Amino acid sequence: MIWHVQNENFILDSTRIFMKAFHLLLFNGSFIFPECILIFGLILLLMIDLTSDQKDTPWLYFISSTSLVMSITALLFRWREEPMISFSGNFQTNNFNEIFQFLILLCSTLCIPLSVEYIECTEMAITEFLLFVLTATLGGMFLCGANDLITIFVAPECFSLCSYLLSGYTKRDVRSNEATMKYLLMGGASSSILVYGFSWLYGSSGGEIELQEIVNGLINTQMYNSPGISIALISITVGIGFKLSPAPFHQWTPDVYEGSPTPVVAFLSVTSKVAASASATRIFDIPFYFSSNEWHLLLEILAILSMILGNLIAITQTSMKRMLAYSSIGQIGYVIIGIIVGDSNDGYASMITYMLFYIAMNLGTFACIVLFGLRTGTDNIRDYAGLYTKDPFLALSSALCLLSLGGIPPLAGFFGKLYLFWCGWQAGLYFLVSIGLLTSVVSIYYYLKIIKLLMTGRNKEITPHVRNYRRSPLRSNNSIELSMIVCVIASTIPGISMNPIIAIAQDTLF
């Protein structure tokens, strides 16, 4: 009898929860329409995988790419609409959040064609790979629009869990397993610290979880200058720091970059930074409005350490992927300058602009690494010597992307850094900008060192990997080359037409 009553109560409670969820989705679904497209794509992938054979592999790529493109289209149609808060305050849609969602979708759209040939050559499971990529993209998009502490914690965990699985996708590779274990342990520790910071913020604000309500709660409780807020600030900075991977929270980055499959590294190197940057700007700018001097100081320290350590250690690397890992640590130092400058001096606009260029530069470089790795089986920098003699197209593409990363005019990377540093200088961050300029010169050195190897490798320096290299035609149906061409063009041409890009970025501010 007791069991029967409990069973009825369980059914009633489950029905109420389902009806409430259906009601929320019915009246708020339009606010997450781009995310719903991705969810529908995920369901289609699962259905095709369960009901068909491996001959339908092209359909899997087509559905993944189409769902991403449709999601981008839905975002563009929603552009310039009035800011809205939905799902009982859990989610916010505005131009600022949507530009970051667009960047994440752009990353994923470029990464899928970059992965096609790699997956086929390495015989990795296709459906699971695409499912993890789309789910991670979904988590990143929800993080960009998150408006309360619970969503800000759950969304990056969705992204992180898929990242752990993707980084350990080659289970038989010892380096991949080691990198995944380190990534998982450090990710779990950072999430715990992040929740600890949220608990202090929740308690100090009188039990509020929405970002703007936390500010009002801190004013009502007079706790905005309390030691608890300082503890929350430090803990949240550490938690977000792991996602952004600035120094000294970068320990996982080189190992994961080196040990994970190259398309996975390409995906993680940009999407994690875009999503974490979107979250960082809103968390620091809204709940910690009264502690702006403190978080500015913390981020300045992180930016200086990242720019110096990232670029100096990159000089000594012998692996291309490991070199790009330390390079990305230096690059995030530049992005942090935009976060510190904030909304007042176009800091966020400069950060968004540079992030757009960084996506093209970084993914273009990784596309070259994927292509070279599939044809030679190595990513050692020495083995790139003399590549121009065998494959001028690949060598020139690599050189353009590396020069753009270094900030050589008239490429996009130069104008992105110029705008970012100019905004920092206007905001009075003279020391930080000076460090950025000096470390940019250092980065040019190790990028040029690689380009010199590519173009002028002597016969005695050319390794068997390049001697036996299979020449590729200039025009090819190779999907990796398609992504590479798009990224190379985006790394060069936008530098000439900066004004429209800056205008769009400025239009996204709060």
UniProtKB/Swiss-Prot annotation:
Enzyme Commission number(s) from the entry: 7.1.1.-
Pfam family, one: Proton_antipo_M
Taxonomy, superkingdom: Eukaryota
Statement: the UniProt record of this protein carries the keyword Nucleus: no
Membrane among keywords: yes
Topology in the lipid bilayer: Multi-pass membrane protein
A GO term from the CC aspect: chloroplast thylakoid membrane
Subcellular location: Plastid, Chloroplast thylakoid membrane
GO biological process, one term: photosynthesis, light reaction
Keywords: Chloroplast, Membrane, NAD, NADP, Plastid, Plastoquinone, Quinone, Thylakoid, Translocase, Transmembrane, Transmembrane helix, Transport
Transmembrane segments: 31-51, 57-77, 99-119, 124-144, 149-169, 183-203, 229-249, 295-315, 323-343, 354-374, 395-415, 418-438, 484-504
Catalytic function, reaction form: a plastoquinone + NADH + (n+1) H(+)(in) = a plastoquinol + NAD(+) + n H(+)(out); a plastoquinone + NADPH + (n+1) H(+)(in) = a plastoquinol + NADP(+) + n H(+)(out)
Main EC class the enzyme belongs to: translocase
Any GO molecular function: NADH dehydrogenase (ubiquinone) activity
Subunit comment: NDH is composed of at least 16 different subunits, 5 of which are encoded in the nucleus.
PANTHER family: NADH DEHYDROGENASE
Function recorded in the entry: NDH shuttles electrons from NAD(P)H:plastoquinone, via FMN and iron-sulfur (Fe-S) centers, to quinones in the photosynthetic chain and possibly in a chloroplast respiratory chain. The immediate electron acceptor for the enzyme in this species is believed to be plastoquinone. Couples the redox reaction to proton translocation, and thus conserves the redox energy in a proton gradient.
HAMAP family named among the record's database cross-references: NDH1_NuoN_1
Family named by the database record: Belongs to the complex I subunit 2 family.
Protein name in UniProt: NAD(P)H-quinone oxidoreductase subunit 2 A, chloroplastic
Gene behind this protein: ndhB1
